[in-house]
Amino acid sequence: MLYQGETLQLHWLDNGIAELVFNAPGSVNKLDTRTVASLGEALAVLEKQTELKGLLLRSTKAAFIVGADITEFLSLFAAPAEKLQEWLNFANAIFNRLEDLPVPTISAINGYALGGGCECILATDFRVASPDARIGLPETKLGIMPGFGGSVRLPRLLGNDSALEIIAAGKDVSAKDALKVGLVDAVVAPEKLVEAALKMLQQAIEGKLDWRAYRQPKLEPLKLSPIEAAMSFTTAKGMVMQTAGKHYPAPMTAVKTIEAAARLGRDEALKLETASFVPLARSKEARALVGIFLNDQFVKGQAKKLAKGIEAPKQAAVLGAGIMGGGIAYQSALKGVPVVMKDISDKSLTLGMNEAAKLLNKQLERGKLDGMKMAQVLSTIQPTLDYAGIERAQVIVEAVVENPKIKAAVLSEVEGLIGENTVLASNTSTIPINHLAKSLKRPQNFCGMHFFNPVHRMPLVEIIRGEQTSDSTIAAVVAYASRMGKTPIVVNDCPGFFVNRVLFPYFAGFSMLLRDGADFRQIDKVMEKQFGWPMGPAYLLDVVGIDTAHHAQAVMAAGFPERMGKDYRDAIDVMFDNQRFGQKNQLGFYRYSQDNKGKPRKDNDEQTDVLLAEVSQPRQTISDEEIIARMMIPMINEVVRCLEENIIASPAEADMALVYGIGFPPFHGGAFRYLDTLGTANYVELAQRYAHLGALYQVPAGLRAKAEHNESYYPVAAPLSDVSTGQPA
């Protein structure tokens, strides 16, 4: 043994070849600060070995290196700029030493080699991969860019266009595609991976492969003529502007950095990479996107804990077909849980089966599944007009019309036909679970399971715990949602649960702006282009359905009359009374027609202004800043109330529910991350300017208390102090 660290070892093989093995405690290797420092120590030992002829890098885990340890990022990024730069210089010097070893080097890559793992293998001369390998640089998805030489080495290895595509999009590629673009030199069976790597290394040692010729391009400027460079970078910038936009600066920064470094050798190019990385890492976008990654891990971990030891159901049932029921049945069947789909209407069953078939056809067209798999999935959806087969289901999801009497009747009826341990769940969006539970003899077996539309696309499922819901019921439904490929978040019961409870104050802010003379088109534009929502409120209401929103608004007003009740007609009432229900009947705030691909096309409709004049003051000029404040304050206040009332358990779960349920802009990180970025004291000061608008604008007591000391909702990361180890203070 030449070197033994906590996460890697270095020892001799035969014939002067050394092997550096990544073998961290736990299930995966990460290129954390400890491992980077350890790599430097191992190289220091290796550099003294006069008999060294070659070096092999490999992993003992199912993945080579999954990337950096993202749990360290917030501490690293909280460091002063000069400390972070010092740490990057320290790390890059280590990878340069790996690349500059006076012998050939090779990486044997199995599973994932992402982020820092990819940058590590780029520093070796050769790369051999098993067929299951996936290699890439996902940093831009976290609001940063490669920091260990990825933006320098990848373009010089692959050529500019292929490298820009991977880096700007944060992509990873399969072993097969990596071979095509020159990211790996060979793809071999897993059992022959090390053998093949050693064979290639031996060829390099014997001079049959010119390892210096493989290494040299990575040390030199990019081989591009001025015209080629202009074309390549102009195209890349255009694509980034189109896909990432102004709210996600990392992809454009990466492209511009690669462009600026194109005429430089490795060491000077690395200085530019570091100079670009530091401000990105310290940006609010990076904090938000890293926060989302960490919150996603936390939420998935919570789901695993809740469902520990519980098997997902082997058979499920959906009561109520149509678009929603068909979507739930499709998702269940697609993920391997057969489902009975029951409805009282043959027409609805046909609609539900057609919805499932349509979604499967799209998968077929995209090459995600073949005809046999499609037929198999469809065959596991059993449509029925009676309750045939319902007794086999371990979880039954009621998805009938959003009417408490009808839902209660359906739930009561099915309860009499099923076993004592069968779990019942209601896919309701607003009706309190405690209210529906009154119709049941076994309320402990009942909870809410709120899917979002369209079911196949929206990741969130709200699991609603009623007062009498048992832990085993929650565990079973969480296990089912996870099996369906969804992200379940458990909330406590109240009207609207969490997501709709906080969404309707946002719509109320919209209605009040219209009442005060704002233009709904300007509001949509500001909330989409400036704040970053995928849809502005008017457009979102049209997509949700004005009739659906009108009904839900009434439920919310009854549940929270002091804040959500109103004594005036608003824009939603006007649209509803004029049967302008949105996309479903082609008329809402906007007029809709079909484009040449059959998708809804949104156009302005002058009649909307005529109708809204009934409930609006004459048109007023309202600033973008005021629109954002008046739209967001009611939502944020309600989100905070939900945390204070224990409707939602943590800021992390609240923020992920908002991002996954209603598309809260990821670069803000969710409501609590947004609050922390603004500063609680600044937020309270802002909200007080609009306190005269009513109860929705009154800041909750807990938030006021935090604001007195400008406390944050998320823990403040301890900044990095020791650049030789990368450890926090």
From Swiss-Prot:
InterPro entries documented for this protein: 3-OHacyl-CoA_DH_CS, 3-OHacyl-CoA_DH_NAD-bd, 3HC_DH_C, 6-PGluconate_DH-like_C_sf, ClpP/crotonase-like_dom_sf, Enoyl-CoA_hyd/isom_CS, Enoyl-CoA_hydra/iso, FA_oxidation_alpha_subunit
Keywords from the named record: Fatty acid metabolism, Isomerase, Lipid degradation, Lipid metabolism, Lyase, Multifunctional enzyme, NAD, Oxidoreductase
Residues noted as binding NAD(+) in the record, renumbered to the chain: M324, D343, V400, V401, E402, K407, S429, N453
Catalytic activity: a (3S)-3-hydroxyacyl-CoA + NAD(+) = a 3-oxoacyl-CoA + NADH + H(+); a (3S)-3-hydroxyacyl-CoA = a (2E)-enoyl-CoA + H2O; a 4-saturated-(3S)-3-hydroxyacyl-CoA = a (3E)-enoyl-CoA + H2O; (3S)-3-hydroxybutanoyl-CoA = (3R)-3-hydroxybutanoyl-CoA
Site (Important for catalytic activity): E119, E139
Enzyme nomenclature, EC number: 4.2.1.17, 5.1.2.3, 5.3.3.8, 1.1.1.35
Active site: H450
SUPFAM superfamilies: 6-phosphogluconate dehydrogenase C-terminal domain-like (SSF48179), ClpP/crotonase (SSF52096), NAD(P)-binding Rossmann-fold domains (SSF51735)
Protein origin, superkingdom: Bacteria
An example Gene Ontology molecular-function term: 3-hydroxybutyryl-CoA epimerase activity
GO biological process: fatty acid beta-oxidation
Pathways involved: Lipid metabolism; fatty acid beta-oxidation
Region (Enoyl-CoA hydratase/isomerase): 1-189
Pfam family, one: 3HCDH
Function noted in UniProt: Involved in the aerobic and anaerobic degradation of long-chain fatty acids via beta-oxidation cycle. Catalyzes the formation of 3-oxoacyl-CoA from enoyl-CoA via L-3-hydroxyacyl-CoA. It can also use D-3-hydroxyacyl-CoA and cis-3-enoyl-CoA as substrate.
Subunit: Heterotetramer of two alpha chains (FadB) and two beta chains (FadA).
Protein family (similarity comment): In the N-terminal section; belongs to the enoyl-CoA hydratase/isomerase family. In the C-terminal section; belongs to the 3-hydroxyacyl-CoA dehydrogenase family.
Entry protein name: Fatty acid oxidation complex subunit alpha
Protein's gene: fadB
